[in-house]
Amino acid sequence: MVTTDALTPYPSRLVLAYVDESYTSDRFYLGAVVVDGAAAERIEEGLDAIVRDYAGRFGLSPSTELHGNPLFQGKDMWNDVPTRARINVYERAMEVVGASGARVVLRGMNVRRQRERYTDPHPPHEVVLGHLLERVNDCARRAGAHALVVADEVHTQERHRTNFRDFRTGGTPGYRSTTLPQLIDTIHFAPSHHSRLLQAADLVTFLHRRRATHPERDARAQAANDAIWSHITPVVDHELCWEP
C-alpha cells in the first residue's frame, strides 16, 4: 500500500493537452491547448458565459457547441446568427483562451507535397500527431509537468492509441525522436459537444488553418480574422507546418 507520505517527496504538476484537427485536401493541421487546472476552469467558465449571453436568441441554447467551422461560416446551429454576432462570439472566445494561462501548440503538414515525394506516405494524421506530441512534451517539460492528452473523437482513435503507445516505447519517428517522457497514460478521446476545452482547441485550430490556407479577399474579413487571432499569438508555444 502506497501512503501519502511516500508520495510527497516526488511532487509533479499535471497539465492537460486538448487536441483537435483542421484540414483541406492539401494541408493537415493539429492544434493543442495546454492547460493546468486553473486555466481549464477559466476557459470552461468563460466559454459558458459567452454562450449564455446569446442563449434564447437566434435559436441558441446554453449548451450550444462552439465549433469553428459552423461558427465562422454561419452554418448548422449558427445559421441564423448575424455575421457581426458570430465575429463577436469568436473573438470573445479567443480572448478567453488567450487570457486563461493556456499555451498553444500548432503543427501542420503539406499533404500535397508529401504525396508527391513519397510512394507510400503515412496518413497525415499520424505524421502530424507525432510532431505535435513532441512539442507538447517539450511544453510540459518546460512547465515542470507531466501531460495527459485529450482529443476529439475520430473513427481512427484506436490506431492513434496504438501509435501513441509505440511512440512511448520506441520513440517518435524522425530526427527529433523521443519517447515522450512527460506524457502519461494513453490518448483519451471525448465528444467535443460535452467539452468546452475541446471546443477551445477546435476554435484555435480551425482559425489557424483558415489563416494559413485561405487568405481573405475582403480586407474587412482579413482584419477581423487578424483581430481575433491577436488574442492567441502571445500564447503560442510552438507553430510549424512541415513541407516535405
Where are these regions (language model features)?
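Phosphate-ester processing/binding pockets and catalytic centers
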Residues: 1-244
